[in-house]
Amino acid sequence: MMDQILGTNFTYEGAKEVARGLEGFSAKLAVGYIATIFGLKYYMKDRKAFDLSTPLNIWNGILSTFSLLGFLFTFPTLLSVIRKDGFSHTYSHVSELYTDSTSGYWIFLWVISKIPELLDTVFIVLRKRPLIFMHWYHHALTGYYALVCYHEDAVHMVWVVWMNYIIHAFMYGYYLLKSLKVPIPPSVAQAITTSQMVQFAVAIFAQVHVSYKHYVEGVEGLAYSFRGTAIGFFMLTTYFYLWIQFYKEHYLKNGGKKYNLAKDQAKTQTKKAN
């Protein structure tokens, strides 16, 4: 297992075996994750919030850097496959995106990274910040989806992976700057949320198209998994719905929560200056 995770002897087939072996653990981990965060939330109810500024800044910096590297190591291969074999080939056939020792390894790392990313929620709970359904739901589900799709060759996931990498590079960088009290306009957060919805829409399109090619056109030899596609379609459509609701609440309704908060903070700073 460790030779695949560390990349010392990476092979796509070997990495798939690791993912297959982790599937059952991931399902149990999701249940344990939900129980843990709500147990911690109850424990913290009458206790003072932890500051955790330094470890949080380090965490956000690590995830932003990791995500940027993941994008840089996968995107050139994605462009190469599109130029050589066409756009649909990326989500309908196993290509060097998955088998290449660099791109393939970083796609595998993305799959594995969904496990440590669960720590995001621990920071939220221990700092007594609002814990919304959208947050813990997507953390609980994504890891299992990633492992199933990876070892069953449901390669539509590549459009989740590389877009998620670049979005997370900006998102965790944004969190880091916010934690450091750097003033950032709400439009940046809005752009990140918009890009996440675009990511879901593109991945849903890839799933629908490869399913059409498989069932309607009867194309043989596709990298298609009914289970991976079913889990993915359920996951991505529910994410898309939740993110739309979040977008409306925070950026559109009554001026948008984030924009109103920014205005209030600007007024407070003006009063202090006077």
Curated annotation (Swiss-Prot):
EC number: 2.3.1.-
Example of a GO cellular component annotation carried by this entry: endoplasmic reticulum membrane
First-tier enzyme category under EC: transferase
Compartment list: Membrane
Protein's pathway: Lipid metabolism; fatty acid biosynthesis
Signal peptide bounds: none
Keywords: Fatty acid biosynthesis, Fatty acid metabolism, Lipid biosynthesis, Lipid metabolism, Membrane, Transferase, Transmembrane, Transmembrane helix
Tissue specificity annotation: Expressed in the gut and unidentified head cells.
Regions crossing the membrane: 24-44, 62-82, 106-126, 130-150, 157-177, 188-208, 228-248
Annotated disulfide bonds: none
Topology in the lipid bilayer: Multi-pass membrane protein
Biological processes annotated in GO: fatty acid elongation, monounsaturated fatty acid; fatty acid elongation, polyunsaturated fatty acid; fatty acid elongation, saturated fatty acid; methyl-branched fatty acid biosynthetic process; sphingolipid biosynthetic process; very long-chain fatty acid biosynthetic process
Deletion phenotype: Loss of function induces an egg-laying defect from the second day of adulthood with progeny arrested at the larval stage L1. The small larvae maintain morphological integrity and survive for up to 3 to 4 days. Animals had reduced levels of isoheptadecanoate (C17iso) and isopentadecanoate (C15iso). The phenotype could be fully suppressed by feeding with C17iso and partially suppressed by feeding with C15iso.
Example GO molecular function: fatty acid elongase activity
Catalytic reactions on record: 11-methyldodecanoyl-CoA + malonyl-CoA + H(+) = 3-oxoisopentadecanoyl-CoA + CO2 + CoA; isopentadecanoyl-CoA + malonyl-CoA + H(+) = 3-oxoisoheptadecanoyl-CoA + CO2 + CoA
Record function comment: Catalyzes the first and rate-limiting reaction of the four reactions that constitute the long-chain fatty acids elongation cycle. Uses malonyl-CoA to add 2 carbons per cycle to the chain of long-chain fatty acids. Condensing enzyme required for the formation of isopentadecanoate (C15iso) and isoheptadecanoate (C17iso), both play critical roles in animal development and growth.
Family assignment from sequence similarity: Belongs to the ELO family.
Protein name: Long chain fatty acid elongase 5
Organism: Caenorhabditis elegans
Gene for this chain: elo-5
